């Protein structure tokens, strides 16, 4: 089983990585093509394109300018440790053991507007490029057109390497839309996390994002290989709802948020 999650806007390049192991991103030719195009934009154009403040637009213009195809631990960091935000708070990669990183490397992928698809230990230079960005390019009107069926094909390869065909989707709609289902040779398992609020179970963004990270960690630490085993997920008060679930759409409920 292969799990996919979204990246995060918030990055941490200050905290030293908890593992010295690293790999290199596999699709840097595509990343470099995007970087070359992004370098042609002024900070004001970046601000308009990405709906960023002037300060953040300037920061990312500088990031695009300093980006290099030569990745080292001095200018980059393992993706799973560089991303922060709600999903990654739930995943808490800093406390994973070395053998957990080994398992994650084979069974977890992060979708990315700039890098396409990242493995946990792939070095990543800092960037901001959300998948939904309407960046017209040589392949089409936006990043979905740029990546085309590539991400699906790479996921197919990763699944074939582990002799499986189950893809656990813990990514947002914005990012999973970059996976072309028609080109994907996999059974996709979707998951919803709902919290009780005002007498009804609802998807609350902050809690749902954190829960996606917690389930990713659960899969890694428990070495989950069968979707049926996902029903055992019971972290921080969540429990499986057979009534609300379908075979390929699992629903977990929580009556009292843990925080």
From Swiss-Prot:
Gene Ontology CC annotations of this record: cytosol
Segments crossing the lipid bilayer: none
GO biological process assignments: response to hydroperoxide
Protein's name according to its UniProt entry: UPF0246 protein PputGB1_4560
Family: Belongs to the UPF0246 family.
Record-linked NCBIfam families: PRK02101.1-1, PRK02101.1-3
């Amino acid at each position: 089983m292969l799990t996919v999650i979204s990246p995060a806007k918030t990055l941490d390049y200050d905290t030293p990585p908890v593992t010295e192991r690293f790999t290199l991103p596999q699709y840097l030719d595509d990343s470099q093509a995007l970087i070359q195009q992004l370098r042609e934009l002024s900070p004001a154009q970046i601000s308009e394109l990405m709906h960023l403040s002037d300060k953040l637009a300037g920061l990312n213009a500088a990031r695009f300018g300093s980006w290099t195809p030569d990745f080292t631990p001095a200018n980059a960091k393992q993706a799973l440790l560089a991303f922060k935000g709600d999903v990654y708070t739930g995943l808490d990669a800093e406390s994973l053991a070395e053998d957990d990183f080994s398992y994650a490397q084979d069974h977890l992928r992060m979708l990315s507007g700039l890098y396409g698809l990242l493995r946990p230990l792939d070095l990543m230079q800092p960037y901001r490029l959300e998948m939904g960005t309407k960046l017209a390019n040589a392949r089409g009107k936006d990043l979905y057109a740029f990546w085309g069926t590539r991400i699906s094909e790479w996921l197919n390869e990763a699944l074939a390497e582990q002799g499986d065909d189950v893809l656990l989707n813990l990514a947002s709609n914005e990012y999973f839309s970059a996976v072309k289902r028609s080109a994907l040779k996999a059974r996709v398992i979707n998951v919803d996390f709902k919290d009780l609020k005002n007498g009804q179970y609802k998807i609350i963004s902050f809690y749902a994002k954190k829960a996606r990270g917690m389930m990713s960690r659960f899969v890694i630490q428990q070495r989950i290989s069968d979707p049926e085993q996902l029903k055992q997920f019971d972290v921080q008060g969540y429990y499986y709802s057979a009534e609300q679930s379908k075979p390929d759409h699992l629903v977990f409920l929580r009556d009292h948020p843990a925080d």
